[in-house]
Structure formats: structure tokens, C-alpha cells
Swiss-Prot record:
Its biological purpose: Involved in the pyrimidine salvage pathway. Phosphorylates uridine to uridine monophosphate (UMP). Phosphorylates cytidine to cytidine monophosphate (CMP). Does not possess uracil phosphoribosyltransferase (UPRTase) activity that catalyzes the conversion of uracil and 5-phospho-alpha-D-ribose 1-diphosphate (PRPP) to UMP and diphosphate.
Protein name: Uridine/cytidine kinase UKL1, chloroplastic
Subcellular localization, as worded in the UniProt entry: Plastid, Chloroplast; Cytoplasm
Keywords: Allosteric enzyme, Chloroplast, Cytoplasm, Glycosyltransferase, GTP-binding, Kinase, Multifunctional enzyme, Nucleotide-binding, Plastid, Transferase, Transit peptide
């Protein structure tokens, strides 16, 4: 039911601090391994889950936030605070109350006995259609529910346009898994039951003209049982739990900071938190422009590719574990810093991956580098021809090197080999210059603990499975073998 957005006395509430139960953005997609032999299905997955990844004209996918909690818990207040702090982005609020079913004549005669807090009271199918439409970047006409007549207004709607952030608010927005899986972040507002009851009494008596006895009777008969049976169990799906609702300014600040970060990321980074794209600058875009130019000289292609590769390697090293270390400076003062992970090696996927070895050696003196050769054309890129890896690779963190992630088939074969050799999946960091969305889906859905570090995510794969816009055959251009073929 609609809640009072104003603050109340929280003297009876002693809970403090936000509780983070883990940000699970990977829940948006299934974690089951994809069929890597059918690249066309991967392309379909990309187009359906992330339209802006493969179509430059498609609208940018919005960031969907679900806000749930008991009646009068402060959900609306939290939503208003988030909207205010995201003032530089377009934000729309869709309230689940708008999707109440209109009551039949029989139900209207016994409206005092109607349970408005039961899942059946809502038109979940229309709410799902609304969320899917807004997620696709299209506008939607949200119905307006009249709580006096308990019917939807047939003559007026609220037009909701595509926005950067969409907030779905309601007591049961987490109840249906189809709606829940559309959300990028799920927030549960947890407020003491006595506080919620006091708010509800004030709201229903002041705003809806009801007497206190009828409010208490409805609360005991419907609201409290529905909370215990449906609302409270959905708390387990929340990514973030906020005690004290709108009074918890620290929690709301942390949430909005996280949303700001996600809004600045590629859509695939919102889906897969283990994908890292180095921050784009004019320098990086300029180097990408140079190496993608088909008429660039081999010398310039190698020079600017090496510069970009060095940046990717440096960024990848930043994801390795570090330990605190203190050193004495020439001035005699003590400096507290960090020490690099000692157990580290590189593995290049021959032959394009060998182009990244010089940058890795320049960053990590004396590093061991293994090699894997996979026949890309035969057996759908899954034929292992050669491998030479450090004998103690299972004890090391591995930087897997391949400048272009296209279908992901060769990468999956290489990663499977490393895991067979005893390397923990979480110890593998896959470094590349450019990535296709199809390849990211293929690798991340199969190996969710692995990290991918890239300098740019391109649009898609074409019918020949080449990355578009891409940069051609990287190995041939880097080593000059394309000139020999001409």
C-alpha cells in the first residue's frame, strides 16, 4: 500500500548500520555453461540481454533497482532519497501499488475482508510486462489505481519513459522470480514492526479517513500474516538490507555511490562484475583509432599496440593480491606500502597472445611464461595442439594473454586446461585488448570466478565470427605475416 514519505520518531528502533548480504549482479543471467559450439546462439543471447552491446543504435539498457520491505517500512522515503542523489541521471519510480487488480462487485461488497497484501491482489503479469518494456528502452503507460473506488482509472494513465535508472517499489516486488531476475540491484528496507504499525495507523487515518480500530483489525488479520508469509521470506533475495529505512543516510549514500559507479560502466560490466574495462581516455581512444586504421604502417601498429597492451597488463596486475610492506626511505622515514604477489606467471595463447609477452616482461621482471596452441579453425576452436606450462602453475596466479576475445571458444579451452592443471578459477586473469560481447558471455557464464580485463568492448561478431568494428587479424598485423600473404 502507499506509504507516508515523511519521517517519524524512531526512538523505539535501535538497529544501526547497513547490512550488505553481497552484490549478486551475476544473478541476472543463468550460470549454466553455454553451448560453445553454437556461436549463433551466443549472438542471440547478446542481442536479447544487452541490446546496446551489439547495436549502436539501440537504447542503453537501464539500471533496474527493486525496493521491497514491509508496509510503512520507509520504502518510498528511501526511493526519494536515491532519486534526489541521482539528480544528474534520469530516474523513474514505478510503484507496485499501481498494479492492484480492480475489485469485482462481490469483492467490493466485502472490501473490509479483502487481503490487499496477498500476491494475488496484484496483476503481476502486467508488472512484468511493464518492467520488460522499460528495460528494452520503450515507454510504458502505468495504470493509476484509485484506493477509494478500488478500481483502475480507465481514462488516465501515467506515461513512464525510458530512463537511466528504473526503481520498482512494492511490498512484493521480489515475490515473482521473473520480475526479480530483471533487477540489477535488490534492496530490502528493514524496519521494526512497531514502527511500521505506528506509521500505518497514522497514514490510514489521516490520508484514507479510516478509524483506528479498522486499521488494527486489518493489520492483525491480513497485513501481519502476509508479511510473515510472503514479504519477510523475500528478504533472502536482497543484495542490500537497510535497517531503519530513510533514517539510515549512510546506507543510502553507499547505495547511490555504487549506482553511480555502475551507471558509468558498460552494460556487460553490470551483468558480470568480473569484467573490467580500463577507464577510457582520449589517449586510449586515440591509440585505438590508430591501430584500427587498416592503412597504418606495421611499425606504428606495433608501437601503439604495445602501449595499449602495457596499460592492460598494468591494470590486470592491479587485480592480484598484495600484502602490506614497510620500507625505510633515504630520508630515514618509514613508508607503508604493498608488496606484489610472488607466485605469478603468464600464459599466452599462441600466436597472437605472444604479442603481449614483451609488455608483461617489462612489468614483471623474470616472470615465467607458458604457451598454449589451439587450432581455431578445426573442431570449432577446441583442438588443443600444444601446451608448455610451468610445472608449479597450480600454485601461481595466471595472467592469460590473448589480444582479441571473439567467440570465446579458444579461451574456454585454454581456461579448462589451466583448471585441469590445478589452477583455481579465481586465480586466472584474462587480458585482452578488445572483446566481443559474445565472447564475454561465453567465458563469464562458464567461469564466473575468472576476471577479464580489456581496453574496449566492441559491438558484435559478424557472420565470419570476426569482431566488429575490430582490428582485423591481430597476429598477422603485429608480426607482419599479412604482408607475406599478399
Amino acid at each position: 500500500m502507499p506509504e507516508d514519505s515523511s519521517s517519524l520518531d524512531y526512538a523505539m528502533e535501535k538497529a544501526s548500520g547497513p547490512h550488505f548480504s553481497g552484490l549478486r549482479f551475476d544473478g541476472l543471467l543463468s550460470s549454466s555453461p553455454p553451448n560453445s559450439s553454437v556461436v549463433s546462439s551466443l549472438r542471440s543471447a547478446v542481442s536479447s540481454s544487452s541490446p546496446s552491446s551489439s547495436d549502436p543504435e539501440a537504447p542503453k539498457q537501464p539500471f533496474i533497482i527493486g525496493v521491497s520491505g514491509g508496509t510503512a517500512s520507509g520504502k518510498t522515503t528511501v526511493c526519494d532519497m536515491i532519486i534526489q542523489q541521482l539528480h544528474d541521471h534520469r530516474v523513474v519510480l514505478v510503484n507496485q501499488d499501481s498494479f492492484y487488480r480492480g475489485l469485482t462487485s462481490e469483492e467490493l461488497q466485502r472490501v473490509q475482508e479483502y487481503n490487499f497484501d496477498h500476491p494475488d491482489a496484484f496483476d503481476t503479469e502486467q508488472l512484468l510486462h511493464c518492467a520488460e518494456t522499460l528495460k528494452s528502452g520503450q515507454p510504458y503507460q502505468v495504470p493509476i489505481y484509485d484506493f477509494k473506488t478500488h478500481q483502475r482509472r480507465s481514462d488516465t494513465f501515467r506515461q513512464v519513459n525510458a530512463s537511466d535508472v528504473i526503481i520498482l517499489e512494492g511490498i512484493l516486488v521480489f515475490h515473482d522470480s521473473r520480475v526479480r531476475n530483471l533487477m540489477n540491484m535488490k534492496i530490502f528496507v528493514d524496519t521494526d514492526a512497531d514502527v511500521r504499525l505506528a506509521r500505518r495507523i497514522r497514514r490510514d487515518t489521516v490520508e484514507r479517513g479510516r478509524d483506528v480500530n479498522s486499521v488494527l483489525e486489518q493489520y492483525a488479520k491480513f497485513v501481519k500474516p502476509a508479511f510473515d508469509d510472503f514479504v519477510l521470506p523475500s528478504k533472502k533475495y536482497a543484495d542490500v538490507i537497510i535497517p531503519r529505512g530513510g533514517d539510515n543516510h549512510v546506507a543510502v549514500d553507499l547505495i547511490t555511490q555504487h549506482i553511480h559507479t555502475k551507471l558509468g560502466q558498460h552494460d556487460l560490466c553490470k551483468i558480470y562484475p568480473n569484467v573490467y574495462v580500463i577507464q577510457s581516455t582520449f589517449q586510449i581512444r586515440g591509440m585505438h583509432t590508430l591501430i584500427r586504421e587498416k592503412d597504418i604502417s606495421k611499425h606504428d601498429f606495433v608501437f601503439y599496440s604495445d602501449r595499449l597492451i602495457r596499460l592492460v597488463v598494468e591494470h590486470g596486475l592491479g587485480h592480484l593480491p598484495f600484502t602490506e610492506k614497510q620500507v625505510v626511505t633515504p630520508t630515514g622515514a618509514v613508508y607503508t606500502g604493498v608488496d606484489f604477489c610472488k607466485k605469478l606467471c603468464g600464459v599466452s595463447i599462441i600466436r597472437s597472445g605472444e604479442s603481449m609477452e614483451n609488455a608483461l616482461r617489462a612489468c614483471c621482471k623474470g616472470i615465467k611464461i607458458g604457451k598454449i596452441l589451439i587450432h581455431r579453425d578445426g573442431d570449432n576452436g577446441k583442438q588443443l595442439i600444444y601446451e608448455k606450462l610451468p610445472h608449479d602453475i597450480s600454485e601461481r596466479h595466471v595472467l592469460l594473454l590473448d589480444p582479441v576475445l571473439a567467440t570465446g571458444n579458444s579461451a574456454n579451452q585454454a581456461i579448462e586446461l589451466l583448471i585441469q592443471k590445478g589452477v583455481p578459477e579465481a586465480h586466472i586473469i584474462f587480458l585482452n585488448l578488445i572483446s566481443a560481447p559474445e565472447g564475454i558471455h561465453c567465458v563469464c557464464k562458464r567461469f564466473p570466478a575468472l576476471k577479464i580485463v580489456t581496453s574496449e568492448i566492441d559491438q558484435c561478431l559478424n557472420q565470419e565470427f570476426r569482431v566488429i568494428p575490430g582490428l582485423g587479424e591481430f597476429g598477422d598485423r603485429y608480426f607482419g605475416t599479412d604482408e607475406e600473404d599478399q
